[in-house]
Amino acid sequence: ASWGVTGNQSLNDDSALGLGISAYYPYTDMYTIRNVNDEASFVFNRKGNKDLTWEKTQNVNVGVEFDIAGIVEGEVDYFNRLTSDMLFLRSTALSQGYASIPVNDGKMRNAGVEFSLTAHAVKTKDVSLDIRLNGSHYKNSIVELPMDGESGNRMDFYQYTSRFTWVKGGSIYDFYIPTYKGVDPETGYALYKTLNAVDAAGNVLQENVTDVELYKKNHKSEQYSLVEGTPTSDWTKAASDFVGKSATPKLTGGFGFDLRVKDFSLSTTFTYSLGGYAYDYVYA
């Protein structure tokens, strides 16, 4: 068993920083040299944060090793990693002269099991054959979302990309997209799920709710239900919501064998990934 704390100081959100390189100095204001009216000029690039600290990860590991008659040996480990003071780019009002500032905020947990097995299938003077197998299963969950720079409260959700949205208790790799409902037999276009907000009497409050988490945030004090409407081929009217699919595989690992015949040896290694979903941008 072991316990420890590791740090991370890398803030590498290139798209948000607009630098095209890693943010090596997130604690200080940065400027770039540009041509302005044919004159070399220093131009403000991004805002730093002098109070920024290391991102911290607490690691807990518990494992067991075993050997069965020298034929099968292996190891099983349980790990639990809680990351706090996460490095995050908090959006700010553009009137301040910059769009975001790096801060320490949010918590995330990764917990799971890793194993490795080796079977000594053949073991003689001239021939030996070892078969190897290892794997890992883990669950990623968001413990605490960052603060909202405008309201001063914890975020209800955070849209990480156009396909992934973060909520407390969910994974950073949970798909948040419109639900596919088949093909329109008349046009051949793909159909997607729509949602309408209705009150207790069945009156429609809003047709075509396109972002479920955003609607929940903006209508917390209201009583309503989201009712499925007629499928649409218009992507702009489709309802984006969690579809119960994750990009995280259920099990990943590798396998292979080591063969020796006198002075000749052969080793192979293969990798595998079971479960998890991928989004096809070409056919979507």
Named regions from a protein language model:
Residues A1-V167:
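Extracellular/periplasmic, surface-exposed regions of secreted and cell-surface proteins
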Residues D13-A16, G20, V103, V122-K245:
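Conserved small-residue
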Residues F44-N45, A238, P249-K250:
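Flexible glycine/proline-enriched surface loops and loop-helix/loop-strand junctions
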Residues K50, S84-M86, V103, K181, ...:
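Flexible, active-site-adjacent loop/turn segments at secondary-structure boundaries
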Residues G63, Y180, G256:
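Short, surface-exposed charged micro-motifs
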Residues S128-D130, S246-L274:
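Conserved C-terminal beta-signal and adjacent last beta-strands/turns
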Residues S273-A284:
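Extracytoplasmic gating/loop element in the C-terminal half of outer-membrane beta-barrel translocons
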